[in-house]
């Protein structure tokens, strides 16, 4: 019963209230801060729980009045309103009860790489980046290109951008994986559809507490940065390549004129990649334990197909097909993101036995 699951939260909330007013706690700033944080975390559950208890009481009261000659009809009308409210509250409470992803409020590094399909893949990498940038704009987030490598046709072989704002990771985390595109390239005279792919990685920005790197585990190379077509654009060794020896992760950065700035940027991305790798390994281990492979954010997992001739986009994880590709590419990504969030929330609720 959901009611039983809510009582400990109400008890703990009241307990914290008492503790916060005790002189022993008010003199200990560390304890006071920790308790206030805990209280603010459970407050949304407690508020909904109280509302839910009131509705349950009202339902019980009205049910007892159904046989009453004078109040029976009124009680039936009340119940018609209360029952749907109860069901809606139950769903809202279940979502609040499932464990929150600690990374949900973090900013992210978005990395898009052209895969199979050469120039066509690079052009789609550019189109996909623009779609995310438009989506970010709609959400009031800030997008900053950290590094990019252009292809001959003006697409991106690879682009890394930082996206900052409220709840960025919570909404974009399900974008990680392989995105397949089917369309007729402009250079195709026969009108044949070509299939190409890009991979997307979504890495929460991490601080030193999340990822500690031993300097001895790093191999740092400096070299001259090169421009489009390979020509050298710098006379000093400002470009930086950092290799994390234990994981084999390599980050190269040459977008800044200063070696120091390139190194700083490269280290931040390196930490994010290490963190994302660890996170992915944990998710894969959990998925094996559950004998199922959920959308784990694995880059090799094909998550979505964009079919331009049919104006169709399909998300393979939840079997969602929309004939609104144009809207999606203009940044209207919530049409896909909202059903994905709902799907994974429902999965978590089921796993939690709620």
Curated annotation (Swiss-Prot):
InterPro entries: PCRF (IPR005139), Pep_chain_release_fac_I (IPR000352), Pep_chain_release_fac_I_sf (IPR045853), Prokaryotic/Mito_RF (IPR050057), RF-1 (IPR004373)
Modified residues (N5-methylglutamine): 231
Keywords (A to Z) from UniProt: Cytoplasm, Methylation, Protein biosynthesis
NAD among keywords: no
Start-end of Basic and acidic residues biased regions: 284-304
GO molecular function annotations of the record: translation release factor activity, codon specific
Gene3D superfamilies named in the record: 3.30.160.20, 3.30.70.1660, 6.10.140.1950
Post-translational modification note: Methylated by PrmC. Methylation increases the termination efficiency of RF1.
Top-rank taxon: Bacteria
The keyword Protein biosynthesis is assigned to this record: yes
Family per record: Belongs to the prokaryotic/mitochondrial release factor family.
Role description: Peptide chain release factor 1 directs the termination of translation in response to the peptide chain termination codons UAG and UAA.
Entry protein name: Peptide chain release factor 1
Native source organism of the sequence: Nitratiruptor sp. (strain SB155-2)
């Amino acid at each position: 019963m959901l009611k039983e699951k809510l009582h400990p939260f109400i008890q703990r909330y009241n307990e914290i209230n008492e503790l916060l007013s005790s002189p022993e706690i008010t003199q200990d700033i560390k304890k006071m801060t920790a308790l206030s944080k805990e209280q603010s975390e459970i407050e949304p559950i407690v508020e909904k729980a109280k509302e839910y208890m009131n509705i349950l009481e009202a339902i019980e009261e009205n049910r007892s009045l159904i046989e009453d000659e004078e109040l029976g009809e009124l009680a039936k009308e009340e119940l018609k309103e209360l029952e749907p409210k109860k069901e809606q509250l139950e769903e809202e409470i279940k979502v609040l009860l499932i464990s929150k992803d600690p990374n949900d409020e973090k900013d992210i590094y978005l990395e898009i790489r052209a895969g199979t399909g050469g120039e066509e893949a690079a052009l789609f990498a550019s189109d996909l980046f623009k779609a995310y940038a438009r989506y970010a704009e709609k959400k009031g987030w800030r997008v900053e290109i950290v590094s990019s490598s252009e292809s001959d046709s003006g697409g991106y072989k690879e682009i890394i951008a930082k996206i900052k704002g409220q709840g960025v990771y919570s909404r974009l985390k399900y974008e990680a994986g392989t995105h397949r595109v089917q369309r007729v390239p402009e250079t195709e005279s026969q009108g044949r559809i070509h299939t190409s792919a890009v991979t997307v990685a979504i890495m929460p920005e991490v601080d030193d507490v999340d990822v500690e790197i031993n300097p001895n585990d790093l191999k740092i190379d400096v070299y001259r940065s090169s421009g489009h077509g390979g020509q050298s654009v710098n006379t000093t060794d400002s470009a930086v390549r950092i290799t994390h020896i234990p994981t084999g992760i390599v980050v190269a950065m040459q977008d800044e004129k200063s070696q120091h700035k390139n190194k700083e940027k490269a280290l931040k991305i390196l930490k994010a990649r290490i963190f994302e790798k660890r996170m992915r390994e944990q998710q894969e281990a959990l998925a094996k334990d559950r004998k199922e492979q959920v959308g784990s954010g694995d880059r090799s997992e094909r998550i979505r197909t964009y079919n331009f001739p049919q104006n169709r986009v399909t998300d393979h994880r939840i079997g969602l097909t929309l004939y609104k590709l144009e809207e999606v590419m203009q940044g209207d990504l919530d049409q896909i993101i909202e059903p994905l969030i709902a799907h994974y929330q429902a999965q978590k609720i089921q796993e939690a036995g709620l």
